């Protein structure tokens, strides 16, 4: 948890999640710069396996913000979300005639930073979606 006098930033980190970074980034890109409630709705409706650990992480960060600092969950938004590569688990797959093929099982580290929306005046939300991306909250 990072505390500044201007705006508190609540950080939650999940390490060694047994998933490739590519699959986790596909989900993280959808919730970046969204409000806490929008992020929860998006994650509950997306059909990917990466949604569950990210949903747990965002919920944990919001609970920490509410309990430790006393922030309202309705005013929080995801100011930073990133996925980095973790350690690679190396295994061996038995093959014919006593051979063994190497198997690499990737892991990733997920970082979520929540911030209070009322105190962050310098955030500019994009009005038009990027070309080729699906927009969840069209009005």
From Swiss-Prot:
Gene3D superfamilies: Ribosomal protein L22/L17. GO terms for biological process: translation. SUPFAM superfamilies: Ribosomal protein L22 (SSF54843). It comes from the Eukaryota. InterPro entries: Ribosomal_uL22, Ribosomal_uL22_bac/chlpt-type, Ribosomal_uL22_bac/org-type, Ribosomal_uL22_CS, Ribosomal_uL22_sf. Coiled coil: none annotated. One of its GO terms (cellular component) is large ribosomal subunit. Keywords: Chloroplast, Plastid, Ribonucleoprotein, Ribosomal protein, RNA-binding, rRNA-binding. The keyword Methyltransferase does not apply. GO terms for molecular function: rRNA binding; structural constituent of ribosome. Its main location: plastid. It is found in: Plastid, Chloroplast. The keyword Chloroplast applies. This protein binds specifically to 23S rRNA. The globular domain of the protein is located near the polypeptide exit tunnel on the outside of the subunit, while an extended beta-hairpin is found that lines the wall of the exit tunnel in the center of the 70S ribosome. PANTHER family: CHLOROPLAST 50S RIBOSOMAL PROTEIN L22-RELATED, LARGE RIBOSOMAL SUBUNIT PROTEIN UL22M. Part of the 50S ribosomal subunit. NCBIfam families: rplV_bact (TIGR01044). Belongs to the universal ribosomal protein uL22 family. This is Large ribosomal subunit protein uL22c.
């Amino acid at each position: 948890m990072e505390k500044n006098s201007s705006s508190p930033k609540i950080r939650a980190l999940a390490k060694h999640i047994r998933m490739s970074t590519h699959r986790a980034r596909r989900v993280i890109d959808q919730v970046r710069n969204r409000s806490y409630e929008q992020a929860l709705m998006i994650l509950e409706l997306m059909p990917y396996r990466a949604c569950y650990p990210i949903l747990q992480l965002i919920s944990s960060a919001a609970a920490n913000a509410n309990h430790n600092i006393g922030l309202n969950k309705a005013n929080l938004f995801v100011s930073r979300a990133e996925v980095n590569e973790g350690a690679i688990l190396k295994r061996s797959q038995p093959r014919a005639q006593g051979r063994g093929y190497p198997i690499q099982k990737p892991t990733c580290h997920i970082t979520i930073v929540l911030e209070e929306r009322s105190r962050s005046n310098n955030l500019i939300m994009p009005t038009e979606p990027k070309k080729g991306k699906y927009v969840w909250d069209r009005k």
